[in-house]
Amino acid sequence: MDYLTIALAKGRIEGESFKKFKKMGLGDSIDTDTRKLIFKDEENKIIYIHVKPSDVVTYVEKGVADLGIAGKDTILENETDVYEIYDLGFGKCKFAVAGLKGDSIYREDEYLKVATKYPNIAKKYFKEKGQKIEIIKLNGSVELAPIVGLSDVIVDIVETGNTLKANGLEILEDICNISARIISNRASYRFKYEQIQNIIRLFEELDN
């Protein structure tokens, strides 16, 4: 039997992913206290690779990994050609448009200035709404943009909303809910179907 390679995202959903694999008896080879990036489980024929969240979908799409665990935010932003096969139900938050309290999102015959770390998601959302936008790509502290006049609104991940409130901002419109998902390479899903379904069944049993 061939090894199944699974790409695991570092960061926000990392801890919960490792916990689930360990509960299923599949994570004993994973050591979170080491700088190693590859872990081999010879008994269960699984190789885990530890990568940046934004790279999980790339490893899966290119066939380096058969499966990956990544946030829905990463999947949407990267617009890659993979199968999304299971909602893990943790790492829950949402995408939202936020701005100064009482502000209006839409500008008739004007460009809306949108600051975000997720330009593809923002472009798609406002295109569907028929609103012309100017994207201002930021890598952090997106909430600052409307306050200092850099943008009209922001598109960002919101968990509790406390950071928005602390900075005088509010959610103006929800975009979509997000959570951690299992994604599969298209060819792997065909040729390693049984192995992949076995993993999914274990997750389903754990969640039910």
From Swiss-Prot:
Record GO terms (molecular function): ATP binding; ATP phosphoribosyltransferase activity
GO cellular component, one term: cytoplasm
UniProt key word Cytoplasm: yes
Highest taxon above the source species: Bacteria
Subunit structure, as described in the record: Heteromultimer composed of HisG and HisZ subunits.
HAMAP family attached to this UniProt entry: HisG_Short
Name of the molecule in the record: ATP phosphoribosyltransferase
Annotated organism of origin: Clostridioides difficile (strain 630) (Peptoclostridium difficile)
High-level lineage: Bacteria, Bacillati, Bacillota, Clostridia, Peptostreptococcales
Gene this chain is encoded by: hisG
